[in-house]
A protein has these predicted regions:
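Extracellular glycan-recognition/adhesion modules and their associated mucin-like linkers
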Residues: 1-25, 43-71, 90-118, 140-143
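Short, tandemly repeated low-complexity microdomains enriched for cysteine and small residues
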Residues: 21-42, 67-89, 115-137
Length: 143
């Protein structure tokens, strides 16, 4: 039996929390929750750059994580270049742990996907950011 066609994305500093969508908001919540499919993602080639990645919802096909005013939510792909750029991220070595993963925004290259108060957003981060900020921006891709 092969690997599933979807991924779950776990928080580094809240390892029982998964990235999910709830009422179109992107957040991390402790597993288990219902519906479980809210935490299942298809990692697609980036909509704005094939070197990146876009997160497509399994239970809402055609809907992707995208940032708007630095807040990340689930939205239907409208086919625009702006949507594509907002929904594309580039994998990097984890800011808190190089064995994990961080996701840099395509159109704000100094901003990374991170959680703050359990809600996903993009913020400017670097190796000199606080340990908490770097941990908030570090994730594990699994099943």
């Amino acid at each position: 039996m092969g690997a599933p066609a979807w991924n779950r994305i776990k928080s580094y500093n809240f390892p029982d929390h998964l990235i999910r969508h709830a009422d179109n908001a992107a957040r991390i919540d402790p597993y288990p929750f219902d519906p479980y499919a809210d935490a299942q993602w298809r990692l697609r080639p980036g909509l704005a750059s094939s070197s990146g990645v876009s997160f497509e919802s399994v239970n809402y096909p055609g809907h992707y994580l995208r940032h708007s005013n630095y807040v990340v939510g689930l939205a239907a792909n409208d086919g625009s270049s702006g949507f594509a750029a907002d929904a594309t991220f580039h994998r990097t070595a984890g800011l808190a742990d190089g064995g994990w993963t961080s996701f840099r925004s395509h159109n704000f290259p100094d901003h990374y996907l991170r959680h703050a108060n359990y809600v996903l957003r993009i913020d400017p981060l670097s190796a000199s950011s606080s340990a908490v900020d770097r941990a908030d921006a570090t994730f594990h891709i699994g099943y």
